[in-house]
Each structure stands twice: as structure tokens, then as C-alpha cells.
């Protein structure tokens, strides 16, 4: 996997870690409310494995495009989305990780990785990654 994009955002000081986590979990369960061009998300499975919650989802985009992914929620810490390669897209991962370098100073780091050479990047897929 090759890192495609990474950025970090600072969270306003009035937002607590619990509130931030609740927002990240909501985004994992209902990404269609947050990602432009995503039309729906169906939760197919949910299991607890080694202390992390694993979700199986099917997400749909315009034009009838659908894909299945896996989401790993590590309570209060991170959300990782794993997409297996399909006919028209590469395998990829998307990590949202809470960082707190000092008490009350919250950040979320976003890391996008894909199994594709840089010259093969699909502009539409890249735009969706940057919006997530």
C-alpha cells in the first residue's frame, strides 16, 4: 500500500473526546450523510473481535456503483475502513485517528493508502478520498 494523502485537523476546544468519538462512529455507520455522491450505506454485519468492533457495509454511489468494505472501530481511538480491490478500483485503506498531544488538545489524523501506482489514480476516486 502506498500513502496517497494525509492531513490532520484540530478539533475546537469545546468538543470533548467522547463527542469527537461519537461523531467518528456516526460517520462510520452513516457515511452517506457525510460523503458527497454516496447515496446509501447498508450495514451487513457487526462483530466484536479482540476488543474492536468490525462492521461489514455495502455503500452505493451514483450510477449504480456499489462496493463492500470493512470498518474497524477501536473505541475512542480510531476508525479504519478497508476496501478490497474490485474490477475498477484498487484495494485501499482510510484511517481516522484521534490524537491528543496534551490534555484537551484534540486532533484527527486522516491517512489514505491505496494499492495503485500514482499515475493510475482515478480523479473521481481521489476527490472522494479527499472529501471523506
What are these regions (language model features)?
Residues 13, 61-65, 112-116:
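Beta-strand elements of well-folded, non-transmembrane domains
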Residues 14, 18, 51, 97-105:
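Short, surface-exposed loop and linker segments with low hydrophobicity and enrichment for Pro/Ser/Thr
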Residues 2-6, 54-56, 105-107:
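Intrinsic-disorder/low-complexity, polar/charged segments enriched in Ser/Thr/Lys/Arg/Asp/Glu/Gln
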Residues 1-49:
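Hydrophobic ligand-binding cavity/cleft-lining segments
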Residues 7-9, 41-44, 67-72, 91-100:
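Hydrophobic/aromatic beta-strand elements that line small-molecule binding cavities or substrate pockets
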Residues 43-87:
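Glycine-rich portal/gate segments that line the openings of hydrophobic small-molecule binding cavities
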Amino acid at each position: 500500500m502506498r500513502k496517497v494523502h494525509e492531513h490532520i485537523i484540530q478539533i475546537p476546544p469545546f468538543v470533548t473526546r467522547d463527542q469527537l468519538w461519537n461523531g467518528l462512529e456516526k460517520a462510520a455507520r452513516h457515511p452517506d450523510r457525510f460523503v458527497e455522491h454516496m447515496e446509501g450505506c447498508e450495514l451487513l454485519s457487526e462483530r466484536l473481535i479482540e476488543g474492536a468492533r468490525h462492521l461489514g457495509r455495502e455503500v452505493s454511489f451514483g450510477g449504480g456503483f456499489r462496493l463492500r468494505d470493512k470498518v474497524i472501530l477501536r473505541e475512542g481511538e480510531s476508525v479504519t475502513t478497508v476496501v478490497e480491490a474490485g474490477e475498477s478500483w484498487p484495494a485501499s485503506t482510510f484511517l481516522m485517528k484521534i490524537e491528543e498531544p496534551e490534555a484537551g488538545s484534540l486532533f484527527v489524523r486522516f491517512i489514505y493508502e491505496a494499492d495503485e501506482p500514482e499515475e493510475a489514480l482515478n480523479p473521481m476516486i481521489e476527490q472522494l478520498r479527499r472529501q471523506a
